[in-house]
């Protein structure tokens, strides 16, 4: 089906397309189905929402992040076709049953997460399955490597030091102090941090009060090489991008499953080439 693009100025986390009820009936799709949005410059998979007022018949509304990812122009003609659920949804159900995932299943799951092929509902089921059933050490290692491979890596010509606090305790924001001390000692520490997951504010939220924290990976590398240390938001660059998508689901649930926490930390550290790492696990 060929439809005209319409920009909708809002985001829903996942890539979202909005179709008129009549077009949905003709296409044979319903709310929460997936559709592929295609044109000569790009294609994305989006989760479908339906309306009889927000878009007209013959239009496809794309919410902010989907519109940007699809690289479309206003009223540009797009091909919209139904696409089935990815195989990785069955892997989520497998983990919900408490079964072990293979390396290939984990890699496929992480790839679908990073490509925005899973809905928020499916992502929530994934996070909940890890919170209840966990992962063994082999699965966690495979999850870590799959997350690293899903994005960019940064290479430095010197030894890289890093620090991570798992957080969760209000007021425990030691990272800015540690990074400052390490950088003042002449060592290189390209620190990336997350926003809040299970507490009121993450390190990136705190630091952003007095300094910008959003940089791309090339800017992060230049800053680290120039001044020795950085305090940056990991979600602003393409380092283990699946992790930041998962964090957005963990936050409203207020959970951070142990296997996901470990994979999150280690994937970001490996992505910046850390040689030495200090982990802080606060109690209280």
Regions found by a protein language model. Name each.
Residues 1-97:
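Long, compositionally biased stretches
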Residues 84-170, 209-210:
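Acidic, glycine/proline-rich low-complexity segments that act as flexible tails and inter-domain linkers
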Residues 225-272, 276:
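Phosphate/diphosphate-binding glycine-rich loops and adjacent basic-rich segments that engage nucleotide
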Residues 206-230:
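A glycine-rich helix N-cap at a beta->alpha junction
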Residues 156, 162-163, 189-193, 216, ...:
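General beta-strand structural signal in soluble alpha/beta enzymes
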Residues 208, 273-284:
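Helix-rich terminal scaffold detector
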Residues 160-183, 187-199:
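Glycine/serine-rich anion-binding loops at beta->alpha junctions
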Residues 146-149, 174-186, 205-215, 248-252:
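A glycine- and small-aliphatic-rich helix-loop capping segment at beta-alpha/alpha-beta transitions
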